[in-house]
Amino acid sequence: MFRIGQGYDAHRFKEGDHIVLCGVKIPFGRGFAAHSDGDVALHALCDALLGAAALGDIGRHFPDTDARYKGIDSRVLLREVRQRIASLGYTVGNVDVTVVAQAPRLAAHIQAMRENLAQDLEIPPDCVNVKATTTEGMGFEGRGEGISAHAVALLARR
């Protein structure tokens, strides 16, 4: 049996000197306003995985009202989601993440992002895709107010 999930997340910018996407620290003139590290790509992916397993969303499992998750590395959350899915008898088949950002340019970081996801999900790198796009100046991403991400995940019964 196969199950498909879709996820989305967005964070606005705040003062800072870097952002984190798929666990990769990227130098930038701003940071994310968030309870955790603000990794929108991993948050969208967690939602896609949880959705595929009919387990709700990231906020249900890791609420921003819980001090344990203040500033947490979102890779920790992703690994926990993978473990919860595995406990239900599912493996991750493949994932596809799209980051929507006017800036910074992400091409130089995509391979490291893919490697992090493959490692954390315990799947081959050729089962992981990460891509970036802009909105050509439209919307909150285009105005430089923040970044969003979309993710799709396929689960297979072991």
Swiss-Prot record:
Q: Which GO terms fall under molecular function for this chain's record?
A: 2-C-methyl-D-erythritol 2,4-cyclodiphosphate synthase activity; metal ion binding
A Gene Ontology BP annotation from the UniProt entry: terpenoid biosynthetic process
CC cofactor = a divalent metal cation
How is its cofactor bound, per UniProt? Binds 1 divalent metal cation per subunit.
Pfam families linked to this entry: YgbB
Q: Which UniProt keywords apply?
A: Isoprene biosynthesis, Lyase, Metal-binding
Q: Where are the residues marked Transition state stabilizer as a site?
A: H35, T134
Under the heading InterPro entries, the entry gives: MECDP_synthase (IPR003526), MECDP_synthase_CS (IPR020555), MECDP_synthase_sf (IPR036571)
What is catalysed by this protein? 4-CDP-2-C-methyl-D-erythritol 2-phosphate = 2-C-methyl-D-erythritol 2,4-cyclic diphosphate + CMP
* Biochemical pathway: Isoprenoid biosynthesis; isopentenyl diphosphate biosynthesis via DXP pathway; isopentenyl diphosphate from 1-deoxy-D-xylulose 5-phosphate: step 4/6
Intrachain S-S bonds: none
EC number(s) for this protein?
4.6.1.12
EC supergroup of this enzyme: lyase
Where a divalent metal cation is bound, by residue? D9, H11, H43
Q: Which SUPFAM superfamilies match?
A: IpsF-like (SSF69765)
Q: How does it assemble?
A: Homotrimer.
Q: What is this protein called?
A: 2-C-methyl-D-erythritol 2,4-cyclodiphosphate synthase
- Annotated source species: Methylococcus capsulatus (strain ATCC 33009 / NCIMB 11132 / Bath)
At the highest ranks, the source species' classification is: Bacteria, Pseudomonadati, Pseudomonadota, Gammaproteobacteria, Methylococcales
Name the gene behind this protein. Answer: ispF
